[in-house]
Amino acid sequence: MNILKNNSYYFMKLITVCELIILLMSRDIKTRYNGNLLNYMMVLAVPLVWISITVISFQYLNRSVPISTDDISFVIAGILPYLLFRYTITATMRTHSFSTSLAVVSQVKKRHVIFSLAAIEFVNAVIIYIIISLINFLIFSRWEAQKPFLIFEGMVIAWLLGLSFGYFCDALSERFPLVYKAVPVMLRPMFLISAVFYTANELPYSLLSIFSWNPLLHANEIVREGMFEGYHSLYLEPFYPLAFSATLFLAGLIFHLICDTENH
């Protein structure tokens, strides 16, 4: 009987947390976009422009994709996980300012805020993927989703990398405010070393031995294996980005505890 009561208690607590997360997501969307659907659509349009420019540059430079697929599908597989990673970091770095506006609500914890801000970016990425895939199918009759679960897995890993990195940077910023300015600079080379517009299989070993330390490269390769029939990454380590994320979460938690102890 006690087991049933405990299970019921934890289930209700989980429902309460989920409702709180959804409420925080709704509040952030209304605050950021002023409750205007057009503003929200403009935010979604930015990644679409990124993808369009990359596809056009492929065609302009006569860059043939290294996989038997079309340019749009190849670009989606590389650039969307990267954008999800980057936008999730940017979103989670707003945790402090967003939490300050909710300081009077004791029920809201920092972990609720950071998760809700990151969750919005994941939802946005899913919407963008669906929009581009439908356009590609309806206009060019191309649909690449051989293993949907692997696509989802790769996107989740890219999201976790962004969430953990953002959480770690948010913790560092409590002691070192310069982190807010340093993060955008640190993210710039990620576009070049994350296998966004090439595959890991194309890289010579001298470069791969360096780039393979980048966990986002592995997330991109997982998405490619899920999208394209017959593609198999020779250098994929699926557990490495998960271990990397766990390390960042742990380091961020330690920094948060240290800062909280000093503040008290």
From Swiss-Prot:
Signal peptide: none annotated. GO terms for molecular function: ABC-type transporter activity. Keywords: Cell inner membrane, Cell membrane, Membrane, Polysaccharide transport, Sugar transport, Transmembrane, Transmembrane helix, Transport. The keyword Mitochondrion does not apply. The keyword Coiled coil does not apply. It is found in: Cell inner membrane. Residues 38-259 form the ABC transmembrane type-2 domain. GO terms for cellular component: ATP-binding cassette (ABC) transporter complex. It is a multi-pass membrane protein. InterPro entries: ABC2_TM (IPR013525), ABC_2_transport (IPR000412). One of its GO terms (biological process) is polysaccharide transport. The chain crosses the membrane at residues 38-58, 65-85, 120-140, 149-169, 176-198, 239-259. Belongs to the ABC-2 integral membrane protein family. May form an ATP-driven Vi polysaccharide export apparatus, in association with the VexA, VexC and VexD proteins. NCBIfam families: PRK15176.1 (NF011723). This is Vi polysaccharide export inner-membrane protein VexB. The lineage of its organism: Bacteria, Pseudomonadati, Pseudomonadota, Gammaproteobacteria, Enterobacterales.
